[in-house]
């Protein structure tokens, strides 16, 4: 099938590339001409495992193209996917400016002789956005244009997005016509995964509800972790005991510094706003957000309690990306920690395997020193803070680390190190919701 993806950011590029890998002919469109030139050269502007090799492969065989023109791209396409940003407004609502602009451009480019088109919202949008997209197309398109609107939310996890697209848990297709539903089912025919057929409104709401529920699990286990810290219980054992119940599962019951990134914070706020707009206070989600917003502050309080005064203390931070296997620092808890540490006068050094370049514009003005080597980052540090769960940090050479630090004190915000291993080397170790290890 011939497909157009409008928006060549994280979602659009990954989706378009994986569709090409399935055998479709795909044109990814973006109004950033520099980005288009970069993509045409075979380079990609983001770090995502497996993505760059698939881009190069599918460009080489002619299944994947990049263009700055919506009008030229959609003429031969059967399906047009909208995958543009939907950033949050200050009140938590979603800014649909890009959606509206792209919808108008699509409408103005559509002609009756192009035949039937299916226009798909891939971006995360509030419920009933599909109705507005349909109204906009009808208003700006010429007469006799045939189209349908579909909602097909993405459920990609940064760091494993390619696998999530090619081997999804489920595919949600929201359509109000059988013809549109059948077209999108053809798009996904190469993938063997359960398909949930819904109306457009339900599909739009599923995305916000799903992400908000996952955020709820994270905040729940972080609240449990605080109880564990006061009682000497181990939150990892708690999570195992809870997660062994098949009705709950172990996934996302990982105590730590909280969630970040471009999806969970935005989607939780948006769902709260949607509910509030409908006159339905969603106090449960408001508490989920509150727990997450204060989790890193609680962690910082523990560091301060241990050091007494943070001013002029050298503190090393391992990890800047909001999670492992990405260079994305949007809403990264690590950066929030760095900001607060610097604000109290600490001397902060930081490192990350992939996110140094994305974090630098934010951290350099704070005075954070960025160091490529993780051990050099920790040299002479009084405390090491682990803020991102990179495997490099989980597998650190503890003897080497002990040799470069001024004090053998670690605050592990992601619970990736073994207390027993640290005890054997003589570290003082504090994590989230687990008993601390005192210095030997």
Regions found by a protein language model. Name each.
Residues 1-440:
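Structural/interface elements that position substrates and couple domains in central-metabolism enzymes
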């Amino acid at each position: 099938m011939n497909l157009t993806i409008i928006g060549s950011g994280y979602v659009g590029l990954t989706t378009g590339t994986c569709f090409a890998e399935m055998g479709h002919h795909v044109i990814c469109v973006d109004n950033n001409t520099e980005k288009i030139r970069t993509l045409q050269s075979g380079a990609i502007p983001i770090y995502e495992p497996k993505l760059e090799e698939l881009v190069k492969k599918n460009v080489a065989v002619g299944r994947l193209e990049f263009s700055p023109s919506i009008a030229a791209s959609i003429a031969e396409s059967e399906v047009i996917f909208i995958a543009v940003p939907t950033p949050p407004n200050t009140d938590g609502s979603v800014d649909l400016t890009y959606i509206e602009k792209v919808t108008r451009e699509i409408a103005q480019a559509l002609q009756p002789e192009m035949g039937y088109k299916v226009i798909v919202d891939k971006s995360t949008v509030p419920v009933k956005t599909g109705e507005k997209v349909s109204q906009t197309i009808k208003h700006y398109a010429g007469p006799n244009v045939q189209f349908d609107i579909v909602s097909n939310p993405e459920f990609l996890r940064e760091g494993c997005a390619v696998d999530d697209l090619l081997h999804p848990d489920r595919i949600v297709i929201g359509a109000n016509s059988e013809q549109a539903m059948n077209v999108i089912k053809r798009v996904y025919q190469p993938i063997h995964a359960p398909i949930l057929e819904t109306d457009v409104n339900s599909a739009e709401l599923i995305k916000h509800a799903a992400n908000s529920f996952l955020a709820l699990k994270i905040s729940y286990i972080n609240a449990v972790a605080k109880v564990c810290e006061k009682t000497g219980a181990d939150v990892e054992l708690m999570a195992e005991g809870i997660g062994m119940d098949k009705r709950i599962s172990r996934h996302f019951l990982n105590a730590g510094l909280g969630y970040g990134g471009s999806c969970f914070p935005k989607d939780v706020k948006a769902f709260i706003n949607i509910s509030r707009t409908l006159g339905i206070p969603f106090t449960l989600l408001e508490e989920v957000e509150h727990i997450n917003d204060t989790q890193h502050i609680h962690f910082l309080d523990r560091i301060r309690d241990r050091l007494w005064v943070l001013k002029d203390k050298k503190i090393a931070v391992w990890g800047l990306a909001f999670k492992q296997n990405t260079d994305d620092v949007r809403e990264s808890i690590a950066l929030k920690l760095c900001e607060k540490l610097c604000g109290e006068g600490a001397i902060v050094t930081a490192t990350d395997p992939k996110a140094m370049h994305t974090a630098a514009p934010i951290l350099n003005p704070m005075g954070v020193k960025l160091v490529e080597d993780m051990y050099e980052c920790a040299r002479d540090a009084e405390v090491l803070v682990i803020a991102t769960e990179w495997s490099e940090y989980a597998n650190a050479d503890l003897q080497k680390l002990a040799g470069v630090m001024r004090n053998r004190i670690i605050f592990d915000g992601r619970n990736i190190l073994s207390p027993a291993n640290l005890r054997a080397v003589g570290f003082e170790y504090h994590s989230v919701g687990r008993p601390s290890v005192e210095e030997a």
